[in-house]
Swiss-Prot record:
Membrane-traversing stretches: 34-54, 65-85, 88-108, 131-151, 160-180
Gene name per UniProt: yciB
InterPro entries given in the database record: YciB (IPR006008)
Membrane topology: Multi-pass membrane protein
Highest taxon listed in the record's lineage: Bacteria
Protein's UniProt name: Inner membrane-spanning protein YciB
Organism of origin: Pseudomonas aeruginosa (strain ATCC 15692 / DSM 22644 / CIP 104116 / JCM 14847 / LMG 12228 / 1C / PRS 101 / PAO1)
Keyword tags: Cell inner membrane, Cell membrane, Membrane, Transmembrane, Transmembrane helix
GO cellular component labels: plasma membrane
Family indicated by similarity: Belongs to the YciB family.
Entry keyword Transmembrane: yes
Length: 195
């Protein structure tokens, strides 16, 4: 459910981008296309994460980072009327997540994925390390895929940002689920998990 909530601002961004081709002027700013969608992304992010914070009195670090990147890069996009700032958001966020997951091998006593999921499932330490490395690779691939599409297919990048990123995430989560199911099944049957 958390992943869906995090995608709400992006989905609204996509909808506004697709249905708002006409030229809209507001307070001296052109808010058509990418700029109207960016304003929607910023507003939706503030509302979604604000509501989550009011409900739980807590946001995860990744949510704070995503909100901050949205506000800064989206704000720069609107202020300078230059969409390049927003185009760098997805690669930068993904690469910084990769850095955080990779850094967790050296800082602290557990890999990042174990810190996130360790309360829910038990795995041997070697599997936590492999799973964490898989997340590092996933975030790196997502960042480079976004960057490639942004600068190679500029007319397609918004579609990729929504459907490509979402599709890659779903496929990765399914793969992770299958990987975990195999090892959790080993634990249930009493077999020694494959490390």
């Amino acid at each position: 459910m958390k992943q869906f909530i995090d995608f709400i601002p992006l989905i609204l961004f996509f909808i506004v981008y697709k249905i708002d081709p006409q030229n809209v002027e507001f307070a001296g700013f052109n808010l058509s296309g990418i700029y109207g969608a960016t304003a929607t992304l910023i507003l939706a992010s503030v509302i979604v994460y604000g509501a989550l914070w009011l409900k739980h009195r807590h946001l995860e670090k990744s949510q704070w980072f995503t909100l901050g990147a949205c506000l800064v890069l989206g704000g720069l996009t609107l202020a300078f009327h230059e969409d390049t700032f927003l185009k760098w958001k997805a690669p930068l966020v993904n690469w910084l997540f990769a850095l955080a997951f990779a850094g967790s091998h050296f800082i602290g006593d557990k890999p990042m994925i174990q810190r996130i999921m360790g309360h829910a499932i038990q795995l041997p330490q070697g599997l936590w390390v492999r799973l964490n490395i898989a997340w590092v690779v996933f975030f790196l691939v997502c960042g480079f895929a976004n960057l490639y599409v942004v600068f190679t297919y500029p007319n397609f990048w918004v579609d990729f940002k929504v459907f490509g990123s979402l599709g890659m995430t779903l496929l990765f989560l399914i793969g992770q689920g299958l990987f975990l199911a195999r090892h959790l099944h080993d634990a249930d049957t009493g077999e020694k998990p494959k490390d």
